[in-house]
Every structure is written in C-alpha cells, then in structure tokens.
C-alpha cells in the first residue's frame, strides 16, 4: 500500500468514526504505530485532521484527499475506465467534464485519440469544464475547444465552484456530461464531498442529453456528503471489470465494464 492509499484509508476511517487512536489505525492498516504517527502528523500539517494525544480526530465532515494524492490510487483501473468512456464521444460533440482523477484520465484519453483532429482550423470536440487542471492540459490541443467556467477555486480538487461557475452551464447545451463521483449508490444516487461541487455537477447533468458516471468499483455502494443526482438521471456507468453492477443495471443504468 502506497502512502497516499494509506492516507485515504485513514481519512475514510476518520470520516466514519470521528476519531482514531494510533494503535487502532495501525491495527486496521497493518502497519507500525511509528508509520501512523508520521501519517497523522503530515495530514495535520495539511489541515486534513486534528492531532490529539495518542491519535487524531476528523478535521471536518466534508474533507477530501487532495487530487494530487488521489491520482496514485487505482491508477490502472481509472485509465481503463477513462479509455472506455472516451469511446462514447463522437467527433463534433460538446461534452461537460467535472474535476477528479478519473475524469482527468478521460481528458487525457480524448487528447490523444487518433480519430479526433482539427480540420480547417475547427476543433473536433468542445469540452466545457470547471476543472483548472483539465483546462490547463487540454488548452494546447488544437483539436479541442476548451470552455472554462469562472468561479472560486478549490485547492483540494482544482475545481471552480459558485454562481460564476454555475452560470456558464445555464448558457450551454451538452451532448454528454461526464461525472467523476465520490460515491454511487442505487438508493442515494451520485454523491461527492463538497456541496458546491455537487451543485455545479448537478447543473452539468441537467444541461446534458446523456449523463455518464465514470467510477471505479471502490466508489460503488458508497455515499458522500452532498448529492449530485439520482440514479434515474444517470444513463451510463463506466466502471472496472471486477465491479458488481447488477443493482445499477436493474435500476435501468447501462453499464460498461472496462
């Protein structure tokens, strides 16, 4: 288990329990207490938890591991999911993409797809996004037209949120909205950790002809703080081959296993 995977597991345990002792965390993750103490100290320095004598408590209900750390988790699954999701995009499409590790991989897959190329100076696809990192990577690609929302930048996810971000989606129509999520549950729908992110993701879904959730199996059956949309509003789920997706298929969601 890498350090970033361990950090994510520690934060998940804190989210569910509220507090952890060093000994409890070491037993849960089968690592030494010295390793856990270092992890707690480093996470406390980043204000992602509060250090206590002998352990730690959750800093806030809605925290999330920064994108730069989450990108190391389940990387191969996310790349396969992204490649399969990218195949859903036809030349000339206008798509919405939110922030996240899987959607970042999707953007990279679209950037390198051989059949998408600019003709007579016109881009092959248009991507509307609120993710600064995705816009930064794709703005140099001549076959991609990038529309970046305004808004307030979140340091954890590099996403722009707020009225300025939502306002852009009021003015556009999308063929597909690609959503990365923190949790996807048949009863509770698609969720994320931040209510402002949920708001703009919801608006993106409303403006799209089709809604595609790209999520690895660790997100299925999970829920986070803020609801994005119900399962009935999701057309396609792209996930990894090991995922148990029967409940989603029974709910009418088309599933693509990558």
Regions of interest found by a model, annotated:
Residues 2-25, 30-33, 45, 77, ...:
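Conserved phosphate- and dinucleotide-binding cores of soluble alpha/beta proteins
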Residues 102-115, 188-199:
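Short Gly/Thr/Asp-enriched flexible loops that form oxyanion-binding sites at enzyme active sites
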Residues 2-7, 11-23, 27-99, 107-127, ...:
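HTH-adjacent hinge/linker in prokaryotic transcriptional regulators
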Residues 100-101, 217:
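Active-site metal-binding loops of divalent metal-dependent hydrolases
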Residues 60-61, 106, 168, 186:
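Residues at secondary-structure transition points
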């Amino acid at each position: 288990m890498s350090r970033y995977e361990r950090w994510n597991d520690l934060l998940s345990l804190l989210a569910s329990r509220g507090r952890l002792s060093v000994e409890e965390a070491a037993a849960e993750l089968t690592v030494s207490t010295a390793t856990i103490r270092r992890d707690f100290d480093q996470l406390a320095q980043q204000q992602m938890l509060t250090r206590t004598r002998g352990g730690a408590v959750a800093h806030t209900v809605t925290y999330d591991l920064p994108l730069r750390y989450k990108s190391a988790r389940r990387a191969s699954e996310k790349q396969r999911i992204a490649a399969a999701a990218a195949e859903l995009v036809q030349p000339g499409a206008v798509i919405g993409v939110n922030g996240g590790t899987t959607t970042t991989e999707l953007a990279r897959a679209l950037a390198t797809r051989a059949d998408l190329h600019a003709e007579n100076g016109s881009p092959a696809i248009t991507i509307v996004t609120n993710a600064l990192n995705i816009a930064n990577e794709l703005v140099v690609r001549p076959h991609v037209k990038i529309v970046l929302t305004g808004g307030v930048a979140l340091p954890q996810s590099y996403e722009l949120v707020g009225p300025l971000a939502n306002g852009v989606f009021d003015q556009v129509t999308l063929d597909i909205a690609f959503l990365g999520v923190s949790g996807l549950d048949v009863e509770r729908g698609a969720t994320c950790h931040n209510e402002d992110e949920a708001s703009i993701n919801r608006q993106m879904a409303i403006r799209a002809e089709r809604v595609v959730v790209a999520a690895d199996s660790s997100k299925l059956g999970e829920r986070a703080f803020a609801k994005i949309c119900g399962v009935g509003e999701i057309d396609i789920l792209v996930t990894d081959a090991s995922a148990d997706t029967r409940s989603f298929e029974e709910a009418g969601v088309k599933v693509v296993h990558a």
